Curated annotation (Swiss-Prot):
This is Large ribosomal subunit protein uL3. The gene is rplC. PANTHER family: 50S RIBOSOMAL PROTEIN L3, LARGE RIBOSOMAL SUBUNIT PROTEIN UL3C. Part of the 50S ribosomal subunit. Forms a cluster with proteins L14 and L19. Methylated by PrmB. The keyword Nucleotidyltransferase does not apply. GO terms for molecular function: rRNA binding; structural constituent of ribosome. GO terms for biological process: translation.
Length: 209
């Protein structure tokens, strides 16, 4: 089963009939329009390419305009691709709504996490801080030793150090689907998802469900 592209609206909470508060993320899933269907003969694999939302005409490049015109769909804010399973069939120009998830219990959500800039090891990797006193006057938040001796004489790859934090592709798996609102094109999932408000999210049925 393919996924859909949506937009993060924000977080809120809803209550069950028993009065239990459930924190949910609201994802707006506008109709995904099929722009291309790839097959084994021409592309070597089966997939469907979709777009969603709208893009100003003066922001659409000529190659994009031709691609959207060939498919007969309105220019969207981007292009995304989903692999097709055996038996799944879609046609160019077809519109896919959030009702795709009507019978889905859990989903995986992929997005770009918030960028935090250059961060130290305490914030980036949850390193423990060193003593505030007891003779320590300079090394409160430094990482400490990053290696051994003349042997091996190098810092190993993957060593946790200070650097860019966030702004990377992150997937949160197996989030419960709390509600599918087809009228307002909304999908409510339990818990938080990566990224800032307004960012694009890829929602797929959970692989571990």
């Amino acid at each position: 089963m393919i996924g859909l592209v949506g937009k993060k609206v924000g977080m809120t909470r809803i209550f069950t009939e028993d009065g239990v508060s459930i924190p949910v993320t609201v994802i707006e899933v506008e109709a995904n329009r099929v722009t291309q269907v790839k097959d084994l003969a021409n592309d070597g694999y089966r997939a469907v390419q979709v777009t969603t939302g709208a893009k100003k005409a003066n922001r659409v490049t000529k190659p994009e305009a031709g691609h959207f015109a060939k498919a007969g769909v309105e220019a969207g804010r981007g292009l995304w691709e989903f692999r097709l399973a055996e038996g799944e069939e879609y046609t160019v120009g077809q519109s896919i709504s959030v009702e795709l998830f009507a019978d889905v219990k859990k989903v995986d959500v992929t997005g770009t996490s918030k960028g935090k800039g250059f961060a130290g090891t305490v914030k980036r990797w949850n390193f423990r801080t060193q003593d505030a006193t007891h003779g320590n006057s300079l090394s409160h938040r430094v990482p400490g030793s990053i290696g051994q001796n003349q042997t091996p004489g190098k810092v190993f790859k993957g060593k946790k150090m200070a650097g860019q934090l966030g702004n990377e592709r992150v997937t949160v798996q197996s989030l419960d689907v709390v509600r599918v609102d087809a009228e307002r094109n909304l999908l409510l999932v339990k818990g938080g998802v990566p990224g800032a408000t307004g960012c694009d999210l890829i929602v797929k049925p959970a692989v571990k469900a």
